[in-house]
């Protein structure tokens, strides 16, 4: 995902995560949770490895874990009582197209392909993050995906549903499982200024419309969790736990 998936338990500068102090202090109670944070790599060519290591949940490490990912994993660990491994590729400001292949974008019907392939930054050029951050970990066995992205696709909200459907097909194919669960987060309310004032609700609508076209999927509602003046809402525990309830 992008920055709301990236946001660590310790929060961003002047943007805290609610309950972070207790979550960090209690992390030693969950030694079966481990997280693998994929380094930010934007690559023109497909990669098969990355420079990172698994981290065990401890008070010293959890502050840098993805907050949504950690709270998701913590809920699963409490419910199942088995080790939980979380692989988290994320890049703030990234577009959905960067996490897809050019071929997958080209094969998506009914979209504005020129706009979809118009990204110019490392985290928005099509296929760059798929090459550098998804392919290196797709040989791991996985039980499912969680996804928190969409703010950076306000410019082409009208194509977001179709692009998300294509992304899910692509990722499931990469893992060799056409039924792998895909659970994602509704974008939380936030007041963008200017011409984009209406675009965020339209992305949210596209997210809900995608449910009907993505089997084995679910969405975690966040209408009650947003902050109209902060794009990174503090209540990440609820987001992670709602995704876990879907799982």
Region locations from a protein language model:
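Cell-envelope and extracellular/periplasmic
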Residues: 2-247
């Amino acid at each position: 995902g992008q920055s709301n998936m990236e946001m660590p338990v310790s929060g961003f500068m002047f943007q805290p995560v609610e309950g972070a102090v207790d979550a960090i202090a209690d992390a030693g109670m969950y030694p079966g949770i481990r997280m693998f944070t994929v380094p930010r790599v934007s690559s023109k060519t497909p990669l098969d490895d990355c420079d990172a290591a698994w981290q065990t949940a401890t008070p010293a490490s959890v502050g840098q874990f993805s907050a949504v990912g950690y709270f998701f994993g913590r809920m699963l660990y409490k419910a199942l009582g088995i080790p939980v491994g979380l692989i988290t590729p994320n890049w703030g400001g990234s577009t959905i197209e960067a996490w897809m292949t050019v071929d997958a974008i080209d094969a998506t019907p009914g979209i504005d392909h020129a706009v979809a392939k118009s990204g110019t930054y490392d985290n928005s050029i099509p296929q760059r993050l798929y090459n550098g951050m998804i392919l290196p970990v797709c040989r791991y066995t996985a039980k499912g995906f969680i996804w928190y992205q969409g703010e950076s696709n306000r410019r082409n909200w009208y194509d977001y549903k179709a692009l998300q459907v294509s992304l899910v097909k692509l990722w499931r194919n990469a893992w060799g499982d056409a039924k792998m669960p895909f659970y994602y987060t509704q974008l939380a309310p936030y007041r963008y200024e200017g011409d984009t004032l209406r675009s965020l609700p339209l992305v949210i609508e596209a997210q809900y419309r995608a449910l009907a076209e993505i089997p084995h999927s679910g969405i975690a509602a966040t209408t009650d969790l947003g902050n109209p003046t902060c794009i990174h809402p503090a209540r990440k525990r609820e987001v992670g736990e709602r995704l876990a309830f879907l799982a």
